[in-house]
Curated annotation (Swiss-Prot):
The gene is pucD. This is Probable xanthine dehydrogenase subunit D. Belongs to the xanthine dehydrogenase family. Binds 1 Mo-molybdopterin (Mo-MPT) cofactor per subunit. Pathway: Purine metabolism; hypoxanthine degradation; urate from hypoxanthine: step 1/2; Purine metabolism; hypoxanthine degradation; urate from hypoxanthine: step 2/2. Keywords: Metal-binding, Molybdenum, NAD, Oxidoreductase, Purine metabolism. The lineage of its organism: Bacteria, Bacillati, Bacillota, Bacilli, Bacillales.
């Protein structure tokens, strides 16, 4: 069905469009200093010495810190704390921090960095997984250059290939991508009288930041307050610590608030990126199109440090067969340390890379078999009660068939290839599935609180962050629908560890789903408290009262009996819940329990003179349960598609010898409004009978299927297959030339 639920203005909408909303990097405090971080001059080197005397003596400089100033663990990392806060004896990439300065102005702090003398001894740069995996390669970490291995096997792959009539093998290469959020990493650390501090900085998990910072500063977590919302975009890039340790070190040393706001160049050098991957797939099928064997090898460049590299690889391995049943499968993944930029959490979380390779591979295999690409998928699509992709138990779902059937009817796919001289058009489609939550048996706690404030507002408190994804709108909509109150009756508190319960991370397409689950648990006891108090106040029977706009109303007449403000005068009232994200009963096997499904159909235009590829038309079909916030749902899918468009056609954070080729957006192009056409969206809200898990997340699913769909459409237009992203104009022109379609001399 098409979304027909009315849209609402987001709670933060007015503040954003008027510019009145204050982001963390907009904040200032009395006596505030400005901080800068000295990053490594080399991608790989020993640190012989560091001298900060000249910087310390510079007028206007109030604090300089090195690793000697870190009171606790001089390491950070969400899962594996392997990245130095401030390097002691070695740097492993150009984003490594060596020292930090706080001064009266940003210009003075910048100048002071130039006065810090660092003597290096350069080391060989491991700038590719191939180089880092050589037998004699220098070890980047004590345990070697392999961060993580992941493996899954089912059936007998070799027997499957022997039984196949057609076997096809190909290698696909995926690029490093920048998050390019509008607000680069930044914030303010404010020292407190008890020896702790308040950190105002964008993050996707305030409580996790608090845990890491407490470990670094060797102080109780309760002495650290994290205020993390709102922020101007994240997409996974602010899930890990960035400027927080440096601002806090400088604030505690100087005794004054310290603000650090990275320039785009600083963000590029130090920030997390999407994992580059090289994926080799070998697939066998019989003459009817039944997939019999599937062998996948994944090599991921995780850069200098771990962050969430292991989880990204696990996710790719889990989704290596996508929404298809293949009896014989073997998937091997390896994540390799290099001296390149750190790769980690990024919208799609490894699903983008493996889905491009898989879906493109199936399109090519269908051509060899002489079978329609969508028919090949239909023959092998997962059934509602099949086990999950790792042969684990999951919530029964027919989402894969739903999106396949919906996108098969797209008017886009009814168009035929068109030759308009030097402009040729083609169409393509692809489907995908995406696990929600952390998965793999990992701790995935959630929670929330409903309370009645002294002002008479129903206050919904969650430990989530507003990254621009619309969690505020989702909370408001769910509370309105489940409690029957009006938007004016609601107050929302998020992004402040001093005020909210633990809800887990604002990642993994889990936020909206967890809010829905929390309110399901909270509404009955919370309403019971409201009704009991209202009955005592009014003399009415609690059974005859229902919540509504402004207060409790008579169930029959709908007349207002008592306002929320009047109920609040009797004292505080609250209910809190804590629970876990739904997980598979097979945590040893791993994988996710809830999945969203998506499909995309596209039309592209290829310029035979320039090699340009333009997206002309696009339609999405998404199966992710009930729609909570229509404009938020659509925004996630369309915004995700725009991000995927950049990944497919233009974005690559190239590195040579461990250095970025582009350190600003004047040389790293992302899609503009003219690159993105109007998009159609089919939201499939139906869940299987007995499904009690409500809405699934859609924050990532829109970024995935569009890439292989575009690649298929390019082939439909000019007959050339693309194995490497982003699509290179030069390589496409060479392929066009080989096809005899050359339009120039």
């Amino acid at each position: 069905m098409i979304i027909n639920k009315p849209s609402r203005v987001r709670p933060d909408g007015r503040g954003k469009v008027t510019g009145e909303l204050k982001y963390m990097t907009d904040l200032s405090f009395p006596g505030m200093l400005y901080g800068k971080v000295l990053r490594s001059a080399y991608p790989h080197a020993e640190i012989v010495s560091v001298c900060t005397i000249k910087a310390e003596k510079m007028e206007g400089v109030q604090a300089v810190v090195t690793h000697k100033d870190v009171p606790g663990l001089n390491r950070f990392g969400i899962v594996i704390p392997d990245q130095p806060v401030l390097c002691e004896d070695r740097v492993r990439y150009v984003g490594d921090a060596i020292a930090a300065v706080a001064a009266e102005t940003e210009e003075i702090a910048e100048a002071a960095l130039e006065l810090i003398q660092v003597e290096y001894k350069e080391l060989e740069v491991m700038d590719s997984p191939e180089k880092a995996l050589r037998p004699n390669a220098q070890r980047l970490h004590e345990d070697g250059n392999i961060l993580h291995r992941a493996f899954f096997s089912n059936g007998d792959v070799e027997e499957g290939f022997q039984a196949s009539d057609t076997v096809f093998e190909e290698t696909y290469e995926l690029p490093r991508q920048m998050h390019t959020y509008m607000e680069t990493e930044g914030g303010v650390a404010v020292p407190e009288d008890d020896g702790g501090f308040t950190m105002y900085a964008g993050t996707q998990h305030g409580y996790k930041d608090r845990f890491q910072l407490a470990r670094i500063f060797d102080i109780p977590e309760e002495k650290i307050r994290i205020v993390s919302s709102p922020m101007g975009g994240s997409f996974g890039g602010k899930d890990e610590l960035n400027i927080q340790p440096y601002a806090a070190l400088l604030a505690l040393k100087s005794g004054r608030p310290v603000k650090i706001h990275q320039t785009r160049k600083e963000s590029v050098r130090s920030g997390i990126k999407r994992h580059p991957m090289k994926i080799t797939i070998k697939t066998g099928a019989d003459h009817s199109g039944n997939l019999l064997a599937h062998d996948v090898k994944i090599v991921a460049d995780t850069g200098a440090y771990a962050t969430l590299g292991p989880a990204v690889l696990d996710f790719s391995v889990e989704h290596a067969a996508g929404p298809y049943r293949i009896p014989n499968i073997r998937t091997e993944g390896i994540s390799v340390f290099t001296n390149n930029g750190v790769a980690g959490e990024f919208r799609g979380f490894g699903g983008n890379q493996i889905t491009f390779a898989l879906e493109t591979h199936l399109d090519r295999l269908s051509g060899m078999l002489g079978i329609d690409p969508l028919e090949l998928r239909r023959k092998n699509i997962r059934k509602p009660h099949d086990l999950g992709p790792l042969e684990h138990r999951i919530a029964p779902t027919d989402g894969a068939a739903q999106v396949l059937n919906a996108i098969s009817k797209s008017p886009i796919l009814k168009k035929t290839s068109r030759n308009c001289g030097y402009l040729q058009r083609g169409t393509g489609a692809a489907i995908t599935m995406h696990g929600g939550g952390l998965g793999f048996g990992r701790m995935d706690a959630a929670g929330g609180r409903l309370s009645l404030s002294s002002e008479g507002k129903i206050t919904a408190s969650f430990g989530f962050e507003e990254c621009g994804q619309g969690i505020l709108a989702a909370i408001e909509q769910i509370v309105m629908e489940e409690l029957g109150c009006a938007a004016e009756d609601i107050s929302i508190v998020i992004g402040d560890t001093a005020k909210v319960p633990k809800s887990g991370s604002s990642t993994a397409s889990r936020g909206t789903s967890m809010v829905w689950h929390a309110i399901q648990r909270l509404k009955k006891p919370f309403l019971a408290q409201l009704k009991k108090r209202a009955a005592e106040w009014s003399g009415c029977s609690a059974e005859n009262l229902i919540p509504g706009a402004a207060g409790l109303r008579d169930k029959n007449t709908k007349a207002l009996v008592v306002t929320y403000k009047e109920l609040a005068e009797k004292g505080p009232l609250a209910e809190e819940t804590a629970f876990d994200f739904p997980t598979t009963p097979d945590p040893v096997v791993g994988g996710h329990f809830l999945y969203s499904f998506g499909a995309a159909a596209v039309e592209v235009e290829v310029d035979l003179l320039t090699g340009d590829v333009k997206l002309i038309d696009c339609e999405h079909a998404i199966a992710a349960g009930p729609v909570v916030s229509p404009q938020g749902y659509r925004g996630q899918i369309e915004g995700g598609a725009a991000m995927a468009l950049g990944y497919t056609l233009m974005e690559e954070a190239k590195m040579t010898d461990g250095r970025y080729a582009a350190e600003n957006l004047d040389h790293y192009l992302i899609p503009g409004i003219k690159d993105v056409p109007d998009m159609k969206l089919i939201a499939i809200e139906d869940l299987m009978k007995g499904d009690v898990y409500g809405p699934r997340g859609v924050g990532e699913i829109g970024t995935i299927a569009i890439t292989p769909a575009i690649v298929k459409a390019v082939h439909d237009a000019v007959g050339c297959w693309i194995n490497k992203l982003p699509i290179s104009r030069e390589e496409l022109l060479e392929a066009i030339d080989r096809k005899g379609l050359k339009q120039w001399t």
